[in-house]
Amino acid sequence: MRMLYFFDICRKRAFETNEAKKLKKNRAAGIILSMKILNYKYFLYLLIITFSVNFFADNASILKSLKVEDGFKVEIFIDEIDTPRQIAESSGGNIFVGSRSSGKITVIDTNKNTRVIAKGLSNATGVTYHRGDLYFSEVDSIWKISNIDNVLKNSSAMPKKVLVTDNLPSDTWHGWKWIDFGPDNKLYVPVGAPCNICNPSMEAKYNFDKRYASIMRLNGGEWEHVARGVRNTVGFDWHPKTNNLYFGDNGRDWMCDDMPDC
């Protein structure tokens, strides 16, 4: 039963205030929480990204601030991974975590021991497990480790990663990627917009790639568009019956408290 979902904490962008400067200076590791349906064996892993050690006083206050319906319980799963972003679970129970700032892919085994299986990456946020293989993303590349559970079981060495593609745009603004395989067994990858509110006057500056602001699908080594006008999706999934694709999109900045009254 596949129950992996992504959650992100929205923050203000008033970076000139003293408090905001503290947040930028003290940007720190996140925690991964698990939410389980009581009396059932299935777990829903919630990924919470915290931008500062000062954002919440401690883990206890985080748990206290979360409200869930009767029959649910939220507890800390692990709290030692730097800026966790996307997670994926293998058939063997290993949990893989992408990180936005550490440049590492980490595995959490069934005993909650952690191990770095890839490092030195650029915004290695996206991870997905498909047919026994692990896939993970950088800004302009997708990598693969085949037969990942057996590799981890049989060797303590750093697994060998194989390049799937390295021809994606290299812009880091909205360049980090949530990745997943669809019901058609094809790899879906977003390409974010390289600016806040893009307009035609910026095309020369950014040398606009037609894949910007879209969700792409890798089909036989070629990229094809699935959705356009998607500024920066930070999560997507498919309806289990209709196979319709649903996604969240991180919209333009400065539209929260600065938005004018209607």
Regions flagged by a language model, labelled:
Residues F6-F7, R27, L33:
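Short hydrophobic targeting helices and cationic amphipathic motifs
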Residues A14, L23-G30:
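Positively charged N-terminal leader segments that act as targeting/secretion signals
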Residues M1-M3:
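Methionine residue identity
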Residues K36-L44:
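Bacterial N-terminal signal peptides that target proteins for export
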Residues D58-C262:
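Beta-propeller domains with acidic blade repeats across secreted/periplasmic ectodomains
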